[in-house]
């Protein structure tokens, strides 16, 4: 029987690549985005099964989203949290509303989706969660103090949750990408940054998706942070 996977932030970038790979592996995939039309377009393009809209900063929308997935596809086996935003600025120039948005979407939203997903996973005595972090959470970066805090907070949350639910046969892991060629990195000077990366190039979303799939399916890995950065951390 095909496993059911919910991919938050699954309409673009890394999340879309994950959803596409899971659909190719014959999983039942729900693509969740804040924009329903964008989610529907992604589902049509990649051959997923269900498109839903959800603002992860709103708990009631998360609850409704999981109910829709269960009603249409069944109990969720895999959860991937790839929804996220960036608002790069030096801390002294960062607006208070941007601080709250970054933490609300990148960290609290993931915490809330995990909390709701766990109810079903505990009932079925098993499940796997992969949260998308960032190398910035590990190493820090100028102009990304709040973004980095949200991603490092995600790592601490995931490791603690992994300890809480391991006895329930539920695994929780993190993939921490470096520079990946997506909309979020389109304004970066790729040629100069490539010099910092031992492998000499930005990664592709599909390469991160392979790492996500590996952690979702690995039955004896939990509480792990898998860095996918072409060796960038060796230079930071």
Swiss-Prot record:
> Could you tell me the EC number(s) of this protein?
1.-.-.-, 1.1.1.-
Name the pathway: Lipid metabolism; fatty acid biosynthesis
Q: Which UniProt keywords apply?
A: Fatty acid biosynthesis, Fatty acid metabolism, Lipid biosynthesis, Lipid metabolism, Mitochondrion, NAD, NADP, Oxidoreductase
The Gene Ontology terms for molecular function here are: 3-oxoacyl-[acyl-carrier-protein] reductase (NADPH) activity; oxidoreductase activity, acting on the CH-OH group of donors, NAD or NADP as acceptor; quinone binding
**Superkingdom assignment:** Eukaryota
Explain the purpose of this protein: The heterotetramer with HSD17B8 has NADH-dependent 3-ketoacyl-acyl carrier protein reductase activity, and thereby plays a role in mitochondrial fatty acid biosynthesis. Within the heterotetramer, HSD17B8 binds NADH; CBR4 binds NADPD. The homotetramer has NADPH-dependent quinone reductase activity. Both homotetramer and the heterotetramer have broad in vitro substrate specificity and can reduce 9,10-phenanthrenequinone, 1,4-benzoquinone and various other o-quinones and p-quinones.
This one is known as: Carbonyl reductase family member 4
Q: Which organism is it from?
A: Xenopus laevis
Gene name, per UniProt, is cbr4
């Amino acid at each position: 029987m095909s496993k059911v996977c919910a991919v938050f932030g699954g309409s673009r970038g890394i999340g879309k690549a994950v959803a596409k790979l899971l659909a190719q592996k014959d999983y039942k995939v729900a693509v969740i985005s804040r924009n329903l039309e964008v989610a529907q377009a992604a589902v049509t393009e990649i051959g997923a099964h269900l498109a839903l809209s959800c603002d992860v900063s709103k708990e009631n929308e998360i609850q409704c989203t999981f109910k829709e997935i269960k009603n249409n596809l069944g109990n969720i086996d895999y959860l991937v949290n790839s929804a996220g935003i960036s608002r790069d600025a030096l801390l002294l120039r960062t607006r208070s509303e941007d601080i709250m948005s970054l933490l609300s979407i990148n960290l609290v939203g993931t915490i809330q989706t995990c909390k709701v997903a766990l109810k079903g996973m505990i009932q079925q005595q098993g499940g796997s969660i992969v949260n998308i972090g960032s190398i910035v959470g590990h190493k820090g970066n100028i102009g990304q103090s709040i973004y980095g805090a949200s991603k490092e907070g995600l790592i601490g949350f995931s490791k603690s949750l992994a300890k809480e639910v391991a006895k329930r046969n539920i695994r929780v892991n993190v993939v921490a990408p470096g520079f990946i060629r997506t909309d979020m990195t389109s304004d970066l000077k790729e040629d100069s940054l490539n010099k910092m990366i031992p492998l000499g190039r930005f990664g592709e979303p599909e390469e991160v998706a392979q790492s996500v799939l590996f952690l979702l399916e690995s039955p004896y890995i939990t509480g792990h942070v898998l860095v996918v950065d072409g060796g960038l951390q060796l230079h930071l």
